[in-house]
Amino acid sequence: MSEQSKCPVTGRTAGHPVAGGGMSNRDWWPNQLPLDMLHQHSSLVNPMGEAFRYKEEFKKLDLGAVKKDLYALMTDSQEWWPADYGHYGGLFIRMAWHSAGTYRTSDGRGGGGTGNQRFAPLNSWPDNANLDKARRLLWPIKQKYGKMLSWADLMILAGNCALESMGFRTFGFGGGRVDIWEPEEDIYWGKEVEWLGSNRYSGERDLENPLAAVQMGLIYVNPEGPDGNPDPVAAGRDIRETFARMAMNDEETVALVAGGHTFGKCHGVGDPNLIGPEPEAAPIEEQGLGWKSGYGSGKGDETMTSGLEGAWTPDPIHWDMGYLGMLFKYEWELTKSPAGAWQWKPKDVAEEDLAPAAHDPSKRVPTMMTTADLAMRMDPIYGPISRRYYEHPDQFADAFARAWFKLTHRDMGPKSRYLGAEVPAEDLIWQDPVPAVDHELITEGEIAELKMRILASGLPIPELVSTAWASASTFRGSDKRGGANGARIRLAPQKEWEVNQPEQLQRVLHELEKIRDTFNGEQSGGKRVSLADLIVLGGCAAVEEAARRAGHDVTVPFAPGRTDASQAETDVESFAALEPLADGFRNYAKRKYSVTPEEMLIDRSQLLTLTAPEMTVLVGGLRVLGINFRQSPHGVFTRHPETLTNDFFVNLLDMGTEWKPVSHEHDTFEGRDRKTGEPSWSATRVDLIFGSNARLRAIAEVYGSDDAQEKFVHDFVAAWDKVMNLDRFDLS
């Protein structure tokens, strides 16, 4: 075999000679742009069909009947995987927690909103060991209710029912999570190449963004302590960083840990080397189950999971104050589990504080705490909070109920998306509430009149388009946050973001507010227009005018109905996570990053739920409309600015231009006429990628063709309309 026929990175040669086998393009060229993540979860992989609407099916569901079935399941112990203490509650709480607990605030990805625990890599993470059994236990219920109940909803609901069946009163439940049917390829879980690797820190323990978990394959932190070092104070620092990146403050963190660990037990009774492969690596006859243990029967009291062993409380299947009671009642001594994991045992434990053996109630065994648990007492911030909860059980119960609800619903977006009879009435700040529409909406005639007023105001096309884009493009399809509804672009922190060019933004908002106030003052009835609507309408009017200048009479769709949120309804710290580090659509980067600008464009496009053609046509259109950050000339490949032409593509593809880098980092470029040597254009990597990448060039060639101008305008308007309405869940 010649060296040329081997992969230059892995050294591998072609594998099985079947369709889809052999070396992939990414094996040969590992730095390929990940465009495939823009085309995930299409109708081609979804067996439900394009007409399926889960929201309508869920409305048919008898939620009470489902919960009754789940309550019955909790104590219906199965021989193939018997329930600890005769109750599956602890297992289902862990399943729901680990489904929701992958969420991180930085990019909104992860979480329990898609049922992704069914697929790799999550279904095979070490921290999810034996949760495959929990999902198999749920299958008869999923089978019974079919398309009316998604796996994503069922897993979270099972966690709620587990808590309720053990005496805890939950805060509520909102359905509406839609299942995916293939693994998510857009989520960066880390660069480690082995399970439990921790090559994600720099400096004195600076965790890489956007990650939240401390090691590959863990949901949160290492329960034995940082990198297995049993130091509770150091563990507290890891816990604080990780939970903060998952949207939890200190009080919520303590409530979740103490509340969740009131139930169930850990499993580490034998040799961890006897545990078989995870589901994705297990043999076909295991039928998707993994971690088959060769220690004894491999189940019941001989179960192996985390390597830790024991319950936290003397009564692991009832809600009580046992966790905090044990935490403060005893001093704790470092020991090792039978599997060799670091854990802590209570000194001189009283008989009444022993727990029953999980599968033999006649036996009593000691409880345990992990290093992470002891951080709830020994950390200087967590300790006083834990003590207060211990002394005030009602506060603790309320805090846990609210934190659990937040954990399991944080990635669902606004409350308007929640379904079912158990949705709490209370609005919560982390839900990014916007006021309900309490006025008559503007008519088509009034929309046309307002467009004329906006264009007559003297506000230039680039500023109107830029403001509308800045408002709407904060949306993240990952956790359904952001968007134009609420007009939060006028509030902190968005009004101060560099990318939004605050001085220009305030000038535009001031003019739009005057138009709004004048219009609303002219109305004799209850009709009004919100600033949120007017911001989007201004962008639409500007796009129409730019198209008219190019010779195209188009109407950009507009649907009124947005309202204006207040600063009190806006969590400044939470919204800070939505600030763009880079926005290739505006040719903006806050600073230089370890990833390329074109990769960040793909990332942002994926969050905006854009396809590669939509991304391409938007970049080309926005360049000629002139919305670049600080009016940069990069990528403005036109002699007719503020006119909606396909000039970006025509000039990018012109072989009469030769491009050369003008920066050492190869991030800015100059295009010169091949014959005269005269400079023609300047560009960034985000601009040139549409001529460099073969797949993007193929799309660019469509829009750069002589007959493409009308198609370009049509497609740009459609993609623009999509972005403007991404958060209009009332329209979908």
Curated annotation (Swiss-Prot):
Residues annotated as catalytic: 98 (proton acceptor)
EC number, UniProt record: 1.11.1.21
Protein origin, superkingdom: Bacteria
One example of a Gene Ontology biological process annotation: cellular response to hydrogen peroxide
Keyword terms: Heme, Hydrogen peroxide, Iron, Metal-binding, Oxidoreductase, Peroxidase
Positions with a binding annotation for heme b: 261
Cross-link Tryptophyl-tyrosyl-methioninium (Trp-Tyr) (with M-246) mapped to chain: 97-220
Cofactor: heme b
GO cellular component: cytosol
Record PTM: Formation of the three residue Trp-Tyr-Met cross-link is important for the catalase, but not the peroxidase activity of the enzyme.
Family matches, as Pfam families: peroxidase (PF00141)
Residues annotated as site: Transition state stabilizer: 94
Residues joined by cross-link Tryptophyl-tyrosyl-methioninium (Tyr-Met) (with W-97): 220-246
Broad enzyme group: oxidoreductase
Cofactor binding note of this UniProt entry: Binds 1 heme b (iron(II)-protoporphyrin IX) group per dimer.
Any GO molecular function: heme binding
Catalytic activity: H2O2 + AH2 = A + 2 H2O; 2 H2O2 = O2 + 2 H2O
Residues covered by region (Disordered): 1-23
Entry-linked SUPFAM superfamilies: Heme-dependent peroxidases
Assembly and interaction partners: Homodimer or homotetramer.
Function: Bifunctional enzyme with both catalase and broad-spectrum peroxidase activity.
Family the UniProt entry places it in: Belongs to the peroxidase family. Peroxidase/catalase subfamily.
Protein name per the record: Catalase-peroxidase
